[in-house]
């Protein structure tokens, strides 16, 4: 699974996932399914934000080829992917600036158009079950919840899906591709079932003992959202020339 993750996801996403697991004292060599899940969640958060801006009139617009002369503000502030200290700094800054209620738990995004925090979920189970788990944990009507599944299903608070249909379709297609690639490598069952995951882990560890890992070729294409992951996180003047560059798993 670890090799698959490094092949399938952008190196910057992999690096952020590694840092997140290290921060919580988790070993990606052992928790390989969690490693894959974190990378998937990160990519969905970035894709959610990609190409969405607010123009001078305060309207939400989609810009794929970007006009460097346009004064555009990113519609979504990305909170996921930051270390906890910086993430809470971002949240506090948003609350102080917008008057939004401070959430009890760290959300994934903030939507400047709808003025609300968003919790993104990616599940291998039934979307309604995962949605209820999220809602029971957050216990706040102020945080908007949007759940995606690997089967193309989704569920959101009050059936408000925030994004246009095409943007959501890109996310669903990416998740379906990840599922298909996992299945083709015999990894999907272990990704879904904890019991199968333990069996696969023992098999992988035994395999690693028998042979050294070969060099891995990775995709260098970068999502536009990843290009703005920098210290000046809250800079509202950020503008960039964007291009459609969604990641695809390399063929076997």
From Swiss-Prot:
Ranges for region Disordered: 202-221
GO-annotated biological processes: viral RNA genome replication; viral translational frameshifting
One Gene Ontology MF term: RNA binding
Compartment list: Host cytoplasm; Host nucleus
Composition bias type Polar residues, residue spans: 208-217
Active site feature: 80, 108
Pfam families assigned to the protein according to its UniProt record, in alphabetical order: Flu_PA (PF00603)
Site annotation Important for efficient shutoff activity and nuclear localization: residues: 195, 198-199
Site (Important for efficient shutoff activity): 28, 65, 202-203, 206
Keywords: Decay of host mRNAs by virus, Eukaryotic host gene expression shutoff by virus, Host cytoplasm, Host gene expression shutoff by virus, Host mRNA suppression by virus, Host nucleus, Host-virus interaction
Major subcellular site: host cell
Domain notes: The probable endonuclease active site in the N-terminus and the basic amino acid cluster in the C-terminus are important for the shutoff activity. The C-terminus acts as a nuclear localization signal. The C-terminus is recruited to host protein complexes involved in nuclear Pol II RNA processing.
Function according to Swiss-Prot or TrEMBL: Plays a major role in the shutoff of the host protein expression by cleaving mRNAs probably via an endonuclease activity. This host shutoff allows the virus to escape from the host antiviral response. Hijacks host RNA splicing machinery to selectively target host RNAs containing introns for destruction. This may explain the preferential degradation of RNAs that have undergone co- or post-transcriptional processing.
Family: Belongs to the influenza viruses PA-X family.
Protein name: Protein PA-X
């Amino acid at each position: 699974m670890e090799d698959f993750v490094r092949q399938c996801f952008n190196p910057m996403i992999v690096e952020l996932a590694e840092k997140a697991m290290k921060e919580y004292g988790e070993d990606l060599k052992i928790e390989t399914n969690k490693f894959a899940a974190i990378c998937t969640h990160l990519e969905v958060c970035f894709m959610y934000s990609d190409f969405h801006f607010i123009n001078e009139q305060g309207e939400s617009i989609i810009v794929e080829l970007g006009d460097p002369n346009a004064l555009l503000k990113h519609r979504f502030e990305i909170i996921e992917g930051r270390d906890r200290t910086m993430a809470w700094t971002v949240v506090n800054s948003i609350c102080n600036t917008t008057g939004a209620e401070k959430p009890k738990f760290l959300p994934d995004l903030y939507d400047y158009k709808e003025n609300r925090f968003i919790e993104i979920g990616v599940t291998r189970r039934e979307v309604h079950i995962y949605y209820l788990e999220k809602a029971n944990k957050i216990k706040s009507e102020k945080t908007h919840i949007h759940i995606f599944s690997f089967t193309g299903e989704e569920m959101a608070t009050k059936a408000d899906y925030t994004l246009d249909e095409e943007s959501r379709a890109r996310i669903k297609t990416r998740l379906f591709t990840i599922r298909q690639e996992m299945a083709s490598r015999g990894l999907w069952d272990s990704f879904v079932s904890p019991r199968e995951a333990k069996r696969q882990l023992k098999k992988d560890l035994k395999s690693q003992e028998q042979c050294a890992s070969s060099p891995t070729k990775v995709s260098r294409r970068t999502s536009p959202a990843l290009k703005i992951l920098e210290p000046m996180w809250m800079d509202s003047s950020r503008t960039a020339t964007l291009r459609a560059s969604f990641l695809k798993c390399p063929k076997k």
